[in-house]
């Protein structure tokens, strides 16, 4: 983690994309903190797309199609929901400078959402950054059981179909490890990232 940017700092979209291209991403200590930190972990979380695992119980649920899955229809709704405290996380790292920066990336076509809807209501989702053949997962949320997990499955299917090579989760959690997430050393990650940036995929 590096020194913070000045309070209220606006992160230019081009700077943010360059940061991702070098393996760096921004975070805040909490939603009300005006400062942003650049982060470059020594161990990086990824989900190998060819080894993605769907738990048996979730496969059964997927066959029932409990939610309507949409893409890129409500970015504001998704990032706002990701920024809300929940039972799993009392604090969020999404502050106002980060919210503004990723909204600008979405307008440029470099940020995407996967959304779970039921009866016209957004009940789960995730968002992330697309660059070259790499997708950087940022955050997810659920307002109904398994909604974000179903979005993750649909994300991986879409990345495979679009020719992506790398799904970066930044860190690993017990939840993500159930789907095949692993940690890789920074040097190895940077090699994988460089390869993924050589060509372009389609989200």
UniProtKB/Swiss-Prot annotation:
Database matches in Pfam families: Leu_Phe_trans
InterPro entries in the cross-refs: Acyl_CoA_acyltransferase, Leu/Phe-tRNA_Trfase, Leu/Phe-tRNA_Trfase_C
Cellular localization per UniProt: Cytoplasm
Entry GO MF terms: leucyl-tRNA--protein transferase activity
Key word Transferase present: yes
Biological process annotations from GO: protein catabolic process
EC class of the enzyme, as a word: transferase
Superkingdom of source: Bacteria
Signal peptide (residue range): none
Enzyme Commission code: 2.3.2.6
UniProtKB keywords: Acyltransferase, Cytoplasm, Transferase
GO cellular component, one term: cytoplasm
PANTHER family xref list: LEUCYL/PHENYLALANYL-TRNA--PROTEIN TRANSFERASE, LEUCYL_PHENYLALANYL-TRNA--PROTEIN TRANSFERASE
Function recorded in the entry: Functions in the N-end rule pathway of protein degradation where it conjugates Leu, Phe and, less efficiently, Met from aminoacyl-tRNAs to the N-termini of proteins containing an N-terminal arginine or lysine.
Protein name: Leucyl/phenylalanyl-tRNA--protein transferase
Record organism: Chelativorans sp. (strain BNC1)
